[in-house]
Amino acid sequence: MLFYFGLAVIFLIDSSQTQTLYKVNEVGGSQVDRNLCGSDIPTAIKDICGIKKRQNIPRKYGRDPNNILEKEEFAKRFLRVRRQTTDIVEECCVENCAIEEIAEYC
């Protein structure tokens, strides 16, 4: 909940300019939040990545070494491959970007 509240604060749009934008060249046509360029890009990354880190609360009892879902070799299979063909400037300044796309650069 805190994550979405923080993101809403970051991406407030003037009510006179309210419009919904969608990415059409990607699977799913996800809603984009804002066009970010220049110094807005590192600020957004800092704010979004900081919010994500604060949500990672350490476990009370640690990891169970016998649980296959927590073994490193199994966990790495689920890692998302970062896109190599685009960078954050193209994603957010040229095409507009969604919050999830900014979070990929954390």
UniProtKB/Swiss-Prot annotation:
Disulfide bonds join 37-93, 49-106, 92-97. Keywords: Carbohydrate metabolism, Disulfide bond, Glucose metabolism, Hormone, Secreted, Signal. Residues 1-18 form the signal peptide. This is Insulin-like peptide 03. It holds the Pfam family Insulin. Insulin decreases blood glucose concentration. May have evolved to activate insulin receptors (INSR) in vertebrates. Molecular docking studies reveals unique interaction with the human insulin receptor. In vivo, insulin-like peptide injection reduces blood glucose levels in two models of zebrafish diabetes (streptozotocin- and glucose-induced). Also shorter swimming distance of zebrafish larvae, an effect which is not observed with human insulin. Belongs to the insulin family. Gene3D superfamilies: Insulin-like. InterPro entries: Insulin-like, Insulin-like_sf, Insulin_family. It is found in: Secreted. Its main location: secreted. Residues 19-34, 52-82 form a propeptide. It comes from the Eukaryota.
